[in-house]
Amino acid sequence: MNLQNPKKFKLLIDQAHQVAINVLRPISRKYDKAEHSYPKELDMLASLVDGMNEGGEGMNAGAAIGKRGTNEQGNKNGVNLSTALSVIEMCYGDTALLLSMPRQGLGNSAIAAVANEEQLELFKNTWAAMAITEPNCGSDSAAIRTTAIKDGEDYILNGEKIFVTSGDRADAIVVWATMDKKLGRSAI
């Protein structure tokens, strides 16, 4: 088994490492101290990453959008490795800042992972926050108490969330809820 990074990803890995050193690390401590301030420096970086994702050079959460194969082709997972490698490098700079980047964080990852083609198009270029953490159960997805009950074409949400990542700045929020508490994670 070859555990070396593929040569075709070297440039991407190098670029992500440069972002970690030259963009994320220099502002990391500043936003640790001012944790409720919005890191405006990330807007330019997010635009750059958006452009790379559009060009097929996936670098983060939005990279998987539009990169799925047909049923005949099977799932195209090549973008997953490039995304993982770039995220590893950028976490060297600051993981929290990386997850705070517009359109690249946890909510967008959830959309990229499970949305159908219509939903992918609907939420393209949308900054999505993620609401998973609940009082008394933390972020344990199997323990989620918030429910989503189908009501015609809609779902009625009932529950409480805390610590919504990027919730005050995002355009949309992905809410983790269960459709059947007895089924645990498989009903989310």
Pin down the residues of each PLM region.
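Helix-loop "lid/cap" segments that line or gate small-molecule binding pockets
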Residues: 105-114
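A short, Trp-centered hydrophobic/proline-enriched beta-strand micro-motif
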Residues: 125-134
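A short core secondary-structure module
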Residues: 154, 160-188
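A structural signal for short hydrophobic beta-strand segments in well-ordered beta-sheet cores
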Residues: 148-149
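Hydrophobic, small-residue-rich alpha-helical packing segments that form membrane-like cores
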Residues: 134-140, 155
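Amphipathic, small/basic residue-rich leader segments at the start of a protein or domain
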Residues: 1-101, 122
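Long, well-ordered alpha-helical segments
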Residues: 16-27, 115-121, 152-158, 188
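Short acidic, glycine/serine/threonine-rich loops at helix termini
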Residues: 140-144, 167-170
